[in-house]
């Protein structure tokens, strides 16, 4: 029993693979023609990823729970307003703990959409409002395609981000082309391939995780060649862990407080906490590749990678606590109006 309890706190296979890829890029970074090959392969993998997700997501899932507008507004406010405000407000206190480029990555983390898969998975584990979680998390990802580039220009660029394009409109256009267009084509192809994809979850998982690993390898290869680890001292990495921990603690605490303050039931609270406090690695890394210069992506996504692993481990424990609470509590009264 003790070994089983301890295993919940150990990194999963993907986390270990992610660490291995970062180590590989640090020791054997891709350069020259090899780097160009991996960049092209990464672009194709990202397009395939969004194509498959578009084909997997049903129109019913998109529309399910959409009438619960109070919950969705609160989740979107936490994702796209609360996080950027926290990032800017904490900068005078937490900024000196890390390098300016790393805190630019923290601000980029703050303007990203919520993660989809883990938010829904943790909501299910905790016995929360699943239809609302599917709707909120999916809508957050789609809205992030439009909102995140605008927030990057407002929040991140004034802090010194190295952007790859000369205008946010150009960045939005490239995100639409590389991310949204494959998603829409995939969704339009759903009548033809939707059932095939649903029966092959392992394929989607492989493409999902494989595309992230490719982006991480190419991003960190470019960053290492530009001297990433020489520019970031060990003290800054330790400071970054503290920054991510403080940000996650505040996000979890404030989403819980607001859910209870506005009178949501426990199922809705679970959805708000897990959808409103999480940030998407799957969306964030491709967006960083599009929005920022290649040599800057490694440092930009490092805070996101640390925050992502931290939120997975913390939310796994939190979801189990919610599940035990739901198992021992009486069934909640039905709500007459939403």
Feature-to-residue mapping (PLM):
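Alpha-helical transmembrane segments of multi-pass small-molecule/ion transporters
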Residues: 1-338
